[in-house]
Amino acid sequence: VRGGIVEKIRLGISTCLLGEPVRYDGGHKLDRYLRDTLGQYVEYVPVCPETEAGFGIPRESMHLEGDVEAPRLVTSRTGRDMTEPMVGWAGDRVRQLEVENLCGFVFKANSPSSGMERVKLFDRNHVPRKIGVGVFAGIFMKHFPL
């Protein structure tokens, strides 16, 4: 409360959860509860790693592969490694978010960039295991530990 006015807490959020058409296929993953109900009480700071990193819409879908400690972000059809552009952008973005006074972040589950836990990580035989963390989410959580 500041001057008798209740200030809303600020939360980062994956942009697609607010209904914005930023997913690889031009779609969204609107969560009406987050937008319409919780949104009355919080101020969201939307972040879409793929579009903000310059990957465009539409774009090829991506997945994680390799080592759980240093996963690679790879396009699913052509196998293009997008890790370095994502890591570079994410490092800059988390530093920008320092001034946003965030109280938390709502990540898009299962996303190879924004998934907080149990994201599919493909091994060298292309067998998936739900043990990964999205590239941006991992960098964000290291930068802003609990």
Task: Name every feature range the model reports, one short phrase each.
Residues 7-11:
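Extreme N-terminal starter segment of soluble prokaryotic enzymes
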Residues 1-5:
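Short, Lys/Arg-enriched N-terminal segments with co-localized hydrophobic residues
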Residues 49-69:
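Short, surface-exposed acidic-centric catalytic microdomains
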Residues 18-26:
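Short N-terminal binding/cap micro-motifs at the start of the first secondary-structure element
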Residues 27-45:
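Short catalytic helix/loop segments, enriched in acidic residues and glycine
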